[in-house]
UniProtKB/Swiss-Prot annotation:
GO terms for biological process: arginine catabolic process to ornithine; arginine deiminase pathway. HAMAP family: Arg_deiminase. This is Arginine deiminase. It is an enzyme of class 3 (hydrolase). Its EC number is 3.5.3.6. The gene is arcA. Belongs to the arginine deiminase family. It is found in: Cytoplasm. Pathway: Amino-acid degradation; L-arginine degradation via ADI pathway; carbamoyl phosphate from L-arginine: step 1/2. Keywords: Arginine metabolism, Cytoplasm, Hydrolase. GO terms for molecular function: arginine deiminase activity. It catalyses: L-arginine + H2O = L-citrulline + NH4(+). Pfam families: ADI (PF02274). The active site is at residue 405.
Amino acid sequence: MSAEKQKYGVHSEAGKLRKVMVCAPGLAHKRLTPSNCDELLFDDVIWVDQAKRDHFDFVTKMRERGVDVLEMHNLLTDIVQNKEALKWILDRKITPDTVGVGLTNEVRSWLEGLEPRHLAEFLIGGVAGQDLPQSEGADVVKMYNDYLGHSSFILPPLPNTQFTRDTTCWIYGGVTLNPMYWPARRQETLLTTAIYKFHKEFTEADFQVWYGDPDKDHGNATLEGGDVMPIGNGIVLIGMGERTSRQAIGQLAQNLFAKGAVKEVIVAGLPKSRAAMHLDTVFSFCDRDLVTVFPEVVKEIVPFIIRPDESKPYGMDVRRINKSFIEVVGEQLGVQLRVVETGGNSFAAEREQWDDGNNVVAIEPGVVIGYDRNTYTNTLLRKAGIEVITISAGELGRGRGGGHCMTCPIVRDPINY
């Protein structure tokens, strides 16, 4: 008799974190330059060797607290040794639409000949003209390099894989495969989907796919995991702002209600700004009843509640709530939320929010990991009884994401409310 499959799912924002996926800095970050970092959604180039050391420290601190940490390069290295998985990935990544008619066979043949670890690096790190040996389609490659230059990308790098939170999100007993807002990030979802589809870590687990398909054009329906928080009591918070659209929220809510996965969705209508690109950049849970927030943005959030209701069009009742967002979240959980605001005077608070002071990840109730540079906010959290474990922000933070952004929780315990 076969063993029962392990159940995967995330049932709170601050319960004990059991399993998480991360992606260490690597080749993709070595491709960042002052001339291309804006296009690749980084604010600056980074010192990659130091970033790798700092990320290793981050992973080590999670493992020391009992978290099973999966790393994306390692997962891809495993699955590309499976011919079916490799074909599935390359059929989607190496096409006339992505690399051009003249290079499709050449790039694919070269990638198929790489060692698994190197192949995984290039799937995330991208392929530049200079990477291809002249023996592969020599005439075409030479023309490409002569015209566009050796440093131009045949396949663009994916440095934002560092922020594994966004490409997929685990909501109670299932996962979403997110259609990302920016074209620069959409290939990330394809790679993560391949991992879920082919890696034994997931093929031997029990979970559902709630929404999303990397083979489909979702149009204006965009969803990113930094906006999604399953907080318990059958409630999920979803930020609606720069990166996550009402079109995606409506479809996801319908699917979750149809499967009985949640009882309500609280939508946080965010102002559209770079500083508030996701809900988790201004609001995150540190304990069952404590949140850290950037008040300048959170006070502007317009809350809506969506509930299943077959008597209404599309089977949902949608209502705007004339209360503060924090009030609404606390009431629906049945607790009085304690609030720790971004620390310091107005200048310091704006700087610390920009440096991800509110973007902490809870690894168990009352214990979070955050960046060391946010000294005012970290001090206030500690005064409120939160254990703050710090990691270096100098390099990892240049892509505008903290501990919450750099983790994709896969298994997290519920919290009783």
